[in-house]
Curated annotation (Swiss-Prot):
Glycans are attached at N67, N104, N117. Belongs to the PMEI family. Residues 1-25 form the signal peptide. It is found in: Secreted, Extracellular space, Apoplast. Keywords: Apoplast, Disulfide bond, Glycoprotein, Growth regulation, Secreted, Signal. The gene is PMEI28. It comes from the Eukaryota. GO terms for molecular function: enzyme inhibitor activity; pectinesterase inhibitor activity. This is Pectinesterase inhibitor 28. GO terms for cellular component: apoplast; plant-type cell wall. Residues 34-43 have a biased composition (Basic residues). Its main location: secreted. It comes from Oryza sativa subsp. japonica (Rice). Transmembrane segments: none annotated. One of its GO terms (biological process) is plant-type cell wall modification.
Length: 227
C-alpha cells in the first residue's frame, strides 16, 4: 500500500513544486509593479489644473475700434491693459479710454505737486526757484482740473450724453496746455521733462477717447446692443 502511494506522492510533490513559482509570480507580480509605480506616484506632483484659454491682448473689437482713432498703438495699449476690454462693447471701450486718461491726469497732478514740494527725485532744480515752484503748483492744479473734467465725462457717458462727454474730454486735454504755456512765458526751458511727457500722453489718450465717443454719436443704436 505504501509502495503504491509513493509514486503518487512523488508526483503530487513534483506538480506542487512546478505550480508554486507560477502561483507566486501571478500573486506577487502585480503588487510589485503596483508598489513600484505607487512609490513614484506619491512623489509625483498633482495633476495640473485645466488650462484656461487666455484672451488675446487685443480683442477684435478693440482693434477695429482703435483703427478709427488717430493713435492706434496708444489706443490698443490703453484698452488692452483693462481685462474688461475683451468683452466690452464700444461704449464700454470709450469708458475705459476716459478712465485711463483720468488716471494719467491724476498721476500728473501728483507728480507736479511732488516737484513743487521738493519731494520728487528730480525736484532739486526747482527747490531754489520760487517762480518755478509756483508754476509747478499751478500745473498740479491744472492737471487736477483735467482729472475732474474726465471724471465728469465718464458720468456723462453713463447717462449717454455723448455731446457733453465730448466737451469734458476736450477740456481735460486743454488744461495741461495752460501749464506748458505758463512755463514758456515765465521760465522758458524749465518745463519739467516728466510733465512734458505726461502732457503728450494725456493729449493722445484724450484724442483716443474723443475718437471712440465719436463712434457712439455716429451710430449709437448699433453700440447699445450689449448694454
Amino acid at each position: 500500500m505504501a509502495s503504491s502511494m509513493a509514486p503518487a506522492a512523488a508526483m503530487a510533490i513534483l506538480l506542487l513544486a512546478l505550480l508554486m513559482p507560477a502561483t507566486l509570480c501571478s500573486r506577487s507580480g502585480p503588487p510589485s509593479s503596483k508598489h513600484g509605480h505607487g512609490g513614484h506616484a506619491k512623489r509625483a506632483p498633482p495633476p495640473a489644473s485645466p488650462v484656461v484659454p487666455v484672451a488675446p491682448q487685443a480683442a477684435a473689437l478693440v482693434r477695429a475700434t482703435c483703427n478709427s482713432t488717430a493713435y492706434y498703438d496708444v489706443c490698443v495699449s490703453a484698452l488692452a491693459a483693462d481685462p474688461s476690454s475683451t468683452t466690452a462693447d464700444v461704449r464700454g471701450l470709450s469708458a475705459i479710454a476716459v478712465s485711463v486718461a483720468a488716471a494719467n491726469a491724476s498721476g500728473a497732478a501728483q507728480a507736479a505737486a511732488a516737484l513743487a514740494n521738493g519731494t520728487a527725485p528730480l525736484a532739486a532744480a526747482a527747490a531754489g526757484d520760487g517762480t518755478v515752484q509756483a508754476l509747478l503748483r499751478a500745473c498740479a492744479g491744472k492737471y487736477g482740473d483735467a482729472r475732474d473734467a474726465l471724471a465728469a465725462a465718464k458720468e456723462s457717458m453713463g447717462q449717454q450724453d455723448y455731446d457733453l462727454a465730448t466737451v469734458h474730454v476736450s477740456a481735460g486735454a486743454e488744461y495741461p496746455q495752460v501749464c506748458k504755456a505758463l512755463f514758456r512765458r515765465q521760465r522758458p526751458g524749465a518745463y519739467p521733462a516728466e510733465l512734458a511727457a505726461r502732457e503728450e500722453a494725456l493729449n493722445k489718450l484724450c484724442s483716443v477717447a474723443l475718437d471712440i465717443i465719436a463712434l457712439l454719436t455716429s451710430s449709437p443704436a448699433s453700440n447699445n446692443n450689449n448694454s
